[in-house]
Regions:
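Conserved, carboxylate-rich catalytic/transport cores that coordinate ions
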Residues: 9-194
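Short beta-strand-to-loop capping motifs
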Residues: 1-5
Length: 194
């Protein structure tokens, strides 16, 4: 059987009291396939269900969930890209969380809240509110302050360059994580070819 390392000593003590024969060993690479229990903090834990749809890391691999979670929020916001829709998602999910009627779905609701928040940020930068360009709206003091960070309609290249920079950063960051993972699995020599 398999036991999480944090309760290994308690399990050994319990088995010793029962006078049961057992051997406590560490799993061997390429021989054993121990089950995985991910240990992430609260924010990254919300994204585990998304990561699990692709693949769960092996016992020896690096868990990518905390690394892809911020990118997922940002790219979801890029795709939605509307301040109004993001605010609507935030309000609905927060109302459902506070109502405490859907406690079984709390993680999904918090995930929806953070995705909505990312959409609010990217919607502010793209300058749209339910499809209305905010650069055309006059007389709202808050908008006057935000117009400096919004993409200008005639400056489509600024949005392109920002997307390009973020994409290159994500690819390089992913390659660095792959090097760390390969070093952890096979040693630094195997990571050099990455």
């Amino acid at each position: 059987g398999w036991v999480p390392t944090e309760i290994e000593n308690d399990t050994i003590a319990w088995l010793s009291d029962k006078e049961v024969y057992f051997e406590a060993t560490e799993p061997e690479k390429n021989v054993d396939n121990p089950p995985i229990k991910l240990k992430n903090r609260r924010f990254a834990r919300l994204f585990e269900m998304i990561g699990n749809m692709y693949s769960i890391p092996t016992y020896w691999e690096l868990d990518m969930t905390p690394f892809f979670a911020p990118f997922f929020v940002m790219f979801f916001g890029f795709c939605m890209g509307d301040l109004g829709y993001g605010a609507l998602i935030c309000v609905i999910t927060l109302a459902l969380i506070l109502s405490k009627k859907l406690k079984d779905m709390n993680n999904i609701l918090w995930l929806g809240f953070f995705l909505g928040f990312g959409t609010v940020i990217m919607g502010t930068i793209s300058g749209t509110f339910f499809g209305v360009p905010l650069l055309d709206v006059e007389g709202i003091p808050v908008l006057a302050k935000l117009k400096g960070i919004m993409f200008q309609p005639d400056g489509i290249y600024s949005a392109f360059y920002v997307s390009l920079i973020i994409g290159v950063f994500q690819i390089l960051f992913g390659m660095c994580l792959k090097i760390i993972n390969m070093t952890k699995l096979y040693g630094f020599g195997a990571a050099v070819s990455t």
